[in-house]
Amino acid sequence: VDLDDQGERTFTFMVRPSADLFLVEEDLPQFAAGQWLHVCSIALSAEPSRSTTFAAMESIRSAGGRVSFDPNIRPDLWQDQALLLACLDRALHMANVVKLSEEELVFISSSNDLAYGIASVTERYQPELLLVTRGKAGVLAAFQQKFTHFNARPVASVDTTGAGDAFVAGLLASLAANGMPTDMTALEPTLTLAQTCGALATTAKGAMTALPYQRDLNRQF
């Protein structure tokens, strides 16, 4: 991971294939109603992990659980852009909750107009919840046919590595504990937690260094 003077990062992948891409269906647990499965497109970039991941998504949905999908697109891991688009399309159709970066929304929707892009993705894939993270500019949320902006939590950012993962961790912790919100107002505490986790993760160098513990979060509220 290389950082610029704003704490933004670029990635170089040194090991290919990595161990996680050898996941097979026999490795999957039995899923149950109420559980969550979180997936990124890196798991879809090669076999056997690709088939295993899609099988896991189908399995947990059949069991009454939900799927969270963060494309987390890393172009260096994909030799074939058509295959990337096909995998994204299939995964997005299976996801209950979708978290995109602004750049990923533009890529998937083929539009620089964020409002149009959100409407396009929502219409095509119909997720229960669509979130577009914009760093310091906050989060755009499409939920129950409504569209709202949530301000970011200001911090002194040192390293943005892992911020998206921390955001999703906070998001899923809240959704798993409390269930899907009933309306946009009820969604706000969930996104406050997610944004706090993401913001705190940027306050030290390293992907894991500043990931907050519950005690850290307790001091924020």
Swiss-Prot record:
Listed EC numbers: 2.7.1.4
PROSITE patterns: PFKB_KINASES_2
Reactions the enzyme catalyzes: D-fructose + ATP = D-fructose 6-phosphate + ADP + H(+)
Pfam families xref list: PfkB
Superkingdom of origin organism: Bacteria
UniProt keyword list: ATP-binding, Carbohydrate metabolism, Kinase, Nucleotide-binding, Plasmid, Transferase
Family recorded in the similarity comment: Belongs to the carbohydrate kinase PfkB family.
Protein name: Fructokinase
Organism: Salmonella thompson
